[in-house]
Design a protein with these regions (language model features):
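Active-site environment of divalent metal-dependent phosphoester hydrolases
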Residues: 15-18, 48, 71-74, 174-178, ...
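Active-site gating loops and adjacent loop-to-helix segments of metal-dependent hydrolytic enzymes
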Residues: 19-46, 87, 102, 107-110, ...
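His/Asp/Glu-enriched, well-ordered alpha-helical/loop segment
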Residues: 20-21, 27-40, 166, 207, ...
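Short, solvent-exposed loop/turn and secondary-structure capping segments
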Residues: 18-23, 75-77, 318-319
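Alpha-helical segments flanking ligand/cofactor-binding loops in enzyme cores
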Residues: 54, 158, 178-181, 204, ...
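Metal-associated gating/positioning segment near the N- to mid-region
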Residues: 2-68
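Polyanionic/metal-chelating signatures
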Residues: 49-52, 57-191
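Active-site core of metal-dependent hydrolases
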Residues: 42, 137-231, 246, 286-288, ...
Length: 330
């Protein structure tokens, strides 16, 4: 006996770009020299030989988003990849699949506190986002009018403005979540909220938003003020309100291979079991715009399949076999 599931998916990680067991040598997550770097591409920093990757596969995780970090207001281009291969170009499912934005403490600390420059406040962070998106709109209009121009940072934002890919907003505190939503509405952006630590406080304000809330990581002590109050209960509260929720480890903040355990903890704290399974399969696939090929077992989709010895939320369960693209992997 056992359980067969689609390969598990985490919609927000830094695997391969913030490498296991390394210091600055393997830290390629944050280009903390400029708060606006939309032309930075995660695929250019991913090391397929990160030792965390086979550990994640052995836990049944087959697909992840690899994201730039959250020191920059606009951090760069997120990639959705399969966790198998030696050449990242062959691992990519979709790149870019989203653009990384960040609100809250991280940009303020990196630039205001450490460098004495903008953004020093949440006001400045939001203003920088608006100014950059307005500039990108003007650039796009000029280009569509036939002007011969090329600016890599502005080019990166055109798919976002055309709603071809979403913005992924790093936002913990309730007011930061609402600022992200405000800006997304102003520019008619598709979007997801990453972390959503304070979302329980404003469920009535956000329950009708057409967005995926990527909740977590919820294990461990709060590392900064905006993560105080983080709870495995949040995912269940949001799904009970009818919202789409994915669960994240935010690897390497917490290990990617704990993703099934995180889902189990959410169930223990009140989340519907089926919703928790969706939160590590089809919902993160939707957040990354790759649900046509992964996230469920269906004719025509990629054969990414995991065989568990028991219920995937039982801590004694082991992974019996993992298949990626129909091939059994170790």
């Amino acid at each position: 006996g056992g359980y067969i599931l689609p390969g598990l998916i985490d919609a927000h990680t830094h695997i391969g770009i913030s490498e296991e067991g390394l210091r600055w040598e393997g830290e390629d997550c944050n280009e903390a020299t400029d708060p606006v770097t939309p032309d930075m591409r995660a695929v250019d920093g991913i090391n397929p030989f990160d030792t965390a990757i086979p550990k994640a596969r052995r836990a049944g995780i087959t697909t992840v988003a690899v994201s730039p970090g959250s020191t920059n207001v606009i951090g760069g281009q997120i990639a959705a990849i399969k966790l198998i291969g030696k050449n990242v170009d062959n691992m990519v499912i979709k790149a870019p699949c989203a653009i990384k934005f960040a609100l809250g403490e991280n940009p303020k600390r990196t630039y205001g506190d450490n460098k004495g420059r903008s953004p020093m406040t949440r006001m400045a962070t939001a203003a920088i986002m608006r100014k950059t998106l307005m500039r990108a709109q003007r650039y796009m209009n000029k280009k569509e009018a036939g002007e011969d121009i090329y600016e890599p940072d502005m080019e990166a934002l055109i798919p976002l403005l055309k709603r071809e890919i979403p913005a992924h907003f790093h936002a913990h505190r309730a007011d930061d979540i609402l600022t992200a939503i405000r800006i997304a509405h102003e520019f008619n952006l598709k979007y997801c909220i990453l972390h959503a630590t304070g979302a329980e406080k404003i469920t009535d304000c956000i329950k009708d938003e057409h967005a995926v809330f990527v909740v977590g990581p919820s294990m461990g002590p709060a590392g900064k003020p905006e993560t105080v109050g983080g709870s495995f209960a949040t995912a269940g509260v949001l799904t009970a309100a009818g919202m789409e929720v994915a669960i994240t480890t935010d690897h390497d903040v917490t290990p990617l291979w704990l993703l099934p355990s995180f889902a189990a903890m959410c169930v223990r704290e009140g989340m519907n079991e089926y919703a928790a399974l969706q939160a590590i399969t089809i919902i993160p696939a939707k957040a990354l715009g790759i649900d046509a090929c992964v996230g469920s077992i269906k004719v025509g989709k990629d054969a990414d399949i995991v065989v568990f010895t028991g219920h995937p939320f039982n801590y004694l369960t082991e992974v019996r076999a993992v298949f990626i693209n129909g091939v059994k992997v170790e």
